[in-house]
Amino acid sequence: MTILSLIIIFSFLGSAGAVGGAALSLVFPERVRKTLVPSLISYATGTLLGAAFLGMIPYAIEHTQASSILTTILIGIVLFFLLEKLIIWRHCHDGECEIHGTAGPLILFGDAFHNFVDGVVIAAAFLISIFLGVVTALAVIAHEVPQEIGDFAILLDSGYSRQKAFLYNLLSSSATLPAAVISYFSLKTTQAVIPYILALSAASFIYIAMADLIPVLHQKISIRDSARQFILLLAGIGTILFFRLNH
């Protein structure tokens, strides 16, 4: 199977993860979602951190100077902080986010932008190695499900019907595949920039995990909830480690 075929397949799966998150909001009642989402967030946090520290950063450093990669990661984290302040990269995983009620169109734009970036990240990772592409796509999929559940809640709060909110989620998720294909052909001729794209991708994964997901997990402080979160976080990291050791 060619690299392009793998990029198309896993980008499609990334989009499917986004649609799946919205579909869960349609199928399951709120009581079930409130139990399911924290577990998904815990696992997604582990996969994002694992993909960044066990995959993207080591591979980027192998292909260029470590100091350049670490500087790029630092710049990326600051950049994503600014983008989130502008509510372009806003992540919300519950129904009580401060931007609910007025942010429907902005969430759709931000979600489409985020999914477009996911496509670029997946393509860049596969151009380095199949292992890196697979674990990157896995982290994207794991994070998309709880993110889209949160976005779905925002759209409902903004006055959209359930059917229209699902349709708009479907449209925004479709940005991943064309972005991946375009990036494949663009990056094939500019291989030197791929390590820096991986560094920025790692920065986004680290930022999402540390700034957006972990604070949500801290909202539940019981020993039982904390133990479940810790186990699922380790499971996410362990999944990436498994692929790393067996690729």
Residue ranges of predicted features:
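Intrinsically disordered, metal-sensing/regulatory segments
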Residues: M1-H247
